[in-house]
Amino acid sequence: MANYQNATELSKLTLGKSTQYCSEYTADLLQGVPRSLNRDDLALNQSNLPFVGEDVWYGYELSWLNGKGKPVVAVAEFRFACTSDNIVESKSFKLYLNSFNQTRFSSIKDVEKVLTKDLSKIAGSEASVNLFGVDHCPALDIAKKSDKCICIDGEDISIDNYQYDPQLLATAQDERSGSQIEEYLVSHLLKSNCLITNQPDWASIYIHYRGKAIDHSSLLKYLISFRQHNEFHEQCVERIYCDLQQFCQLDELTIFARYTRRGGLDINPFRSSHIEQAPFARTLRQ
């Protein structure tokens, strides 16, 4: 359980509370969560983060009316820099997007401008918004598995700890190689729970690193220990990044978690020691 679950900033959220749906554009529905809540807990300095990256969201339930009242639908891609002040709370994001349903816009560019303005304001940093027709969206292509990507889910492990335990990484420095290696790993077994509602969050997590070899069994046990942990998607990924660097002291590290969608949105946090922009990599479960 996160140490900041009872923070005042969280008690103000509509998440976990009964709400009414609004079908007329309402920017005030958006709510933000300070990134500092999690980062203070990790002893991270917002002005000197140990990583770069972004949060990439895809919205599959966005619709509005054109100037003649005819419905228009689109798939939306939203990108927020990890240096922004706030993450966007997902329920408020869903309610906000729903408020476009009965609102008229002259063009898709007008919708993009409104989304960019509102989301940049709530995030505290410039947001990137791209809208695609459902037949012309790069996000809809399922990424092919790289031959270099190793799935660690087949490790024959015994486990009875489903509470977050970073000490499981204490033995993760594999002695099979004294020299540096480069590996691209994936696990589809990451599950955590919403900090407020306790709803399950499911993800495939990709870990690309260069350094001394990481023991796959220890890493898998560590990832599974998030199974009963309550924290937002972005916060879990930053915790994983920091833990891996603390225990494994890697020269390069990139983590990309692809969460399954809820309420028409999927969230995909990307953190890296050296790469700022996440790739297109939609998984089968998204």
UniProtKB/Swiss-Prot annotation:
Q: Offer a single GO CC term for the protein.
A: cytoplasm
One Pfam family assigned to this protein is QueF_N
Q: Any idea which GO molecular function terms this record carries?
A: preQ1 synthase activity
Query: What's the catalysed reaction?
Result: 7-aminomethyl-7-carbaguanine + 2 NADP(+) = 7-cyano-7-deazaguanine + 2 NADPH + 3 H(+)
Tell me the Gene Ontology biological-process terms attached to this UniProt entry: queuosine biosynthetic process; tRNA modification
Pathway in which the depicted protein is active: tRNA modification; tRNA-queuosine biosynthesis
Q: Where does this one sit in the cell?
A: Cytoplasm
Keyword list, A-Z? Cytoplasm, NADP, Oxidoreductase, Queuosine biosynthesis
Q: Which domain of life is it from?
A: Bacteria
Q: What is its EC number?
A: 1.7.1.13
Q: Which residues bind substrate?
A: V88, E89, S90, H233, E234
Detail which positions bind NADPH. Answer: S90, K91, R262, G263
Q: Which of the seven top EC classes does this enzyme belong to?
A: oxidoreductase
Q: Which residues form the active site?
A: C194 (thioimide intermediate), D201 (proton donor)
Checking NCBIfam families in the record gives: QueF
PANTHER family for this protein: NADPH-DEPENDENT 7-CYANO-7-DEAZAGUANINE REDUCTASE (PTHR34354:SF1)
As for family, the record states: Belongs to the GTP cyclohydrolase I family. QueF type 2 subfamily.
Q: What does this chain do? A: Catalyzes the NADPH-dependent reduction of 7-cyano-7-deazaguanine (preQ0) to 7-aminomethyl-7-deazaguanine (preQ1).
Q: How does it assemble?
A: Homodimer.
Q: What is this protein called?
A: NADPH-dependent 7-cyano-7-deazaguanine reductase
Q: Say which species the protein is native to.
A: Colwellia psychrerythraea (strain 34H / ATCC BAA-681) (Vibrio psychroerythus)
Write the lineage as a comma-separated list. Answer: Bacteria, Pseudomonadati, Pseudomonadota, Gammaproteobacteria, Alteromonadales
Q: Which gene encodes it?
A: queF
